[in-house]
């Protein structure tokens, strides 16, 4: 059913984006592959989420989980994690990696909108990291994430700001100069300003708690969290 809905365009997914990530799926867990940046920022993302939401014992949903890098680390922190994605190959890789790691994650092929209709107000924590800039309708994604969170639950989004600096760093720098990412990974027109994401979230019934920037130092090759939200940023909300 889901495959037919994807094909006929009734699901909030960009088929070109889906195929792009499917082609790279076998490399998700290679820390020196195209997914190296995700491996490097994962401890920062995990620490930030855990600091706010205290993951141990919580029911957590990871939206757009891909190969499961964040999902598994949240499971290792003591959470009961469900990961959803629409990429068949990414989900297969995620499930296979569980056999190696021994972690427990419930992976499902589902859109966030479909799961919100099935399990409203079900999760203590909802994460949607590095996904909003890849979907045709981010407003729909934000609304569904809000619907999935329990009252008082936490919802986290990370994405890329839209301004000349983010174009220079996230597109030109990351994809063409430093070769951190494959060319064509990002579409500048899909980048989202923090003010825009904040408005989407407020309209979905979420209350903003914090926005924090995530920066890359090309000299030290180290990522860090700080006040600079000009390029990558994370926003934390309560339902």
Curated annotation (Swiss-Prot):
Its EC number is 2.1.1.222, 2.1.1.64. InterPro entries: SAM-dependent_MTases_sf, UbiG_MeTrfase. Transmembrane segments: none annotated. It catalyses: a 3-demethylubiquinol + S-adenosyl-L-methionine = a ubiquinol + S-adenosyl-L-homocysteine + H(+); a 3-(all-trans-polyprenyl)benzene-1,2-diol + S-adenosyl-L-methionine = a 2-methoxy-6-(all-trans-polyprenyl)phenol + S-adenosyl-L-homocysteine + H(+). It holds the Pfam family Methyltransf_23. One of its GO terms (molecular function) is 3-demethylubiquinol 3-O-methyltransferase activity. Gene3D superfamilies: Vaccinia Virus protein VP39 (3.40.50.150). Pathway: Cofactor biosynthesis; ubiquinone biosynthesis. The keyword Cytoplasm does not apply. It is an enzyme of class 2 (transferase). It comes from the Bacteria. GO terms for biological process: methylation. Keywords: Methyltransferase, S-adenosyl-L-methionine, Transferase, Ubiquinone biosynthesis. S-adenosyl-L-methionine binds at residues 45, 64, 85, 129. O-methyltransferase that catalyzes the 2 O-methylation steps in the ubiquinone biosynthetic pathway. Belongs to the methyltransferase superfamily. UbiG/COQ3 family. NCBIfam families: UbiG. This is Ubiquinone biosynthesis O-methyltransferase. It comes from Nitrosospira multiformis (strain ATCC 25196 / NCIMB 11849 / C 71). The gene is ubiG.
